[in-house]
């Protein structure tokens, strides 16, 4: 998986040591829960579906793009599932506010369970999302 030009990530994505715990293997929630742990960031093992992460009690949520946060897409937002939404990990935030996310099981991109890919959003798009700050 190639990192898009002009963006960078702080740690290679290997998925080694990722656990299933309460999130099914290969789902977006499984990926973000484990990717955050690689940076010492904790999320509750019961955050719910992707769109539910933005509404989990006890977590700071902002519309300001934040590096190493979880970005919680509401149903149909940015191609998220209409019922469950989607969640991804913010790898990079540019000075202009555009973001690079990594994600797993984003079926619309032709990928599926356990498959990781990247997407870029412009600053204008990124301002419409919920960023959940881990602990």
Model-derived features: positions:
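Secreted/periplasmic proteins that engage bacterial cell-wall peptidoglycan
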Residues: 1-95, 99-104
């Amino acid at each position: 998986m190639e990192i898009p030009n002009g963006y960078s990530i702080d740690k290679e994505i290997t998925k080694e040591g990722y656990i299933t715990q309460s999130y099914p293997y290969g789902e977006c929630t499984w990926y973000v829960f484990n990717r955050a742990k690689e940076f010492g960031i904790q999320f509750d093992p019961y955050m719910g579906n992707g769109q539910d992460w933005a509404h989990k009690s006890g977590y700071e949520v902002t519309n300001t793009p934040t590096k190493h946060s979880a970005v919680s897409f509401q149903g149909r937002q940015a191609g998220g599932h209409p019922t469950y939404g989607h969640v991804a990990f913010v790898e990079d935030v540019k000075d202009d506010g555009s973001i690079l996310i990594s994600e797993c099981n984003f079926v619309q991109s032709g990928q599926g369970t356990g498959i990781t890919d990247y997407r870029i959003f412009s600053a204008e798009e990124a301002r419409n999302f919920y960023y959940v700050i881990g602990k």
